[in-house]
Amino acid sequence: MNTTVATSPITVLGAGSYGTALAIAFSRNGFPTYLWGHDPVHMQRLSEERQNNAFLPNIAFPDALHIEFDLASALSQSRDLLIVVPSHVFGEVIDKIKPYLRPDHRIAWATKGLERNTGRLLQEVIEEKLGTQHPLAVLSGPTFAKELAAGLPTAIALASNNEQFALEFQARIHCSKHFRVYINQDMIGVQLGGAIKNVIAISAGMSDGMGFGANARTALITRGIAEISRLGASLGANPNTFMGMSGLGDLVLTCTDDQSRNRRFGIMLGQGFSAQTAMDNIGQVVEGFYNAKEAYLLAQRQGIEMPITEQVYQVLFCGKNAQDVAASLLGRERKGE
């Protein structure tokens, strides 16, 4: 890795659990890292306590991690930006940073989701609002924030429209013995896998909440990857992407481990709780709740059959309960795999 990359700062926008975990990972590798969040009270607490006790307690910030209170200042610190905010506010954040962007800024994001109310990929949102002059990259894969921040082994996929940006981003991560990145050329597939897996994870949680067991959960994972692959093919994604980190890897992790908010949310739905009660119980953003509607809209627009996604949408937005969904899926007409 060259000296320029080794000393290049990075600005992380979003100080929730995942944004903080990524900022810790970069700064632990020695990169000057600037972390900005929208809530000044939360940021003041991070600055004083030098850890994110709200989301990642007892994990101290490395010395290279700097807290930024002002957005303009945060953007001025680095050429490279990493956006890690919930998908339903992603467009708003792009609007906020637009006045402060320089021509040399390069923009990456680790947000997993689709644009609210449209189902558009986040790359489309950026290019509509900012044009196509900035190199872009998306980071996605099977990562829980707590494990990443703790330095446990993690692997992830990175897709970019600029080879140099991808290689330099990869070089940053590969300073660590515990954090590995695989470059992928398929930005559409990497974005899509990270978004739709949250919806499938809700269905897997619902199944477990109803006590259906491991067989049913595995069937949902398998048929879920088929849904994601069909939708991806209609949008021009590479089918192989969905067998990698940002596809099957992230899907299996999110559907099977109780660290997953989407899975826990689904479990509560399966147990008969309302969506609002489940959201309140989890206390953090459940991306799959927002993405179910957007994924359903995107599938309808593309003319792609996605029965699991549709049934989750029906539960969240049309008043169905989990038992109705199970009956609908099991009662579908016979077909080949």
Swiss-Prot record:
Does Lipid biosynthesis appear among the keywords? yes
Q: Which PROSITE patterns match?
A: NAD_G3PDH
Alphabetical GO CC annotations of the entry are: cytosol
Tell me the route in metabolism or biology where this protein functions: Membrane lipid metabolism; glycerophospholipid metabolism
For this chain's UniProt record, which GO biological process terms are given?
A: carbohydrate metabolic process; glycerol-3-phosphate biosynthetic process; glycerol-3-phosphate catabolic process; glycerophospholipid biosynthetic process
Q: Record-annotated residues binding NADPH?
A: 17-18, 38, 112, 145, 261, 285, 287
Q: Where does sn-glycerol 3-phosphate bind?
A: 112, 141, 143, 197, 250, 260-262
EC primary class: oxidoreductase
Catalysed reaction per UniProt? sn-glycerol 3-phosphate + NAD(+) = dihydroxyacetone phosphate + NADH + H(+); sn-glycerol 3-phosphate + NADP(+) = dihydroxyacetone phosphate + NADPH + H(+)
Task: Extract the Pfam families matched here.
Answer: NAD_Gly3P_dh_C (PF07479), NAD_Gly3P_dh_N (PF01210)
List its EC numbers: 1.1.1.94
Q: Subcellular location, in the record's words?
A: Cytoplasm
Q: What is its main location?
A: cytoplasm
Write one Gene Ontology MF term: glycerol-3-phosphate dehydrogenase [NAD(P)+] activity
For this UniProt record, the keywords arranged alphabetically read as follows: Cytoplasm, Lipid biosynthesis, Lipid metabolism, NAD, NADP, Nucleotide-binding, Oxidoreductase, Phospholipid biosynthesis, Phospholipid metabolism
Catalytic residues in the record:
197
Name the family. Belongs to the NAD-dependent glycerol-3-phosphate dehydrogenase family.
Query: What is its biological role?
Result: Catalyzes the reduction of the glycolytic intermediate dihydroxyacetone phosphate (DHAP) to sn-glycerol 3-phosphate (G3P), the key precursor for phospholipid synthesis.
Protein name in the entry: Glycerol-3-phosphate dehydrogenase [NAD(P)+]
State the organism of origin: Pasteurella multocida (strain Pm70)
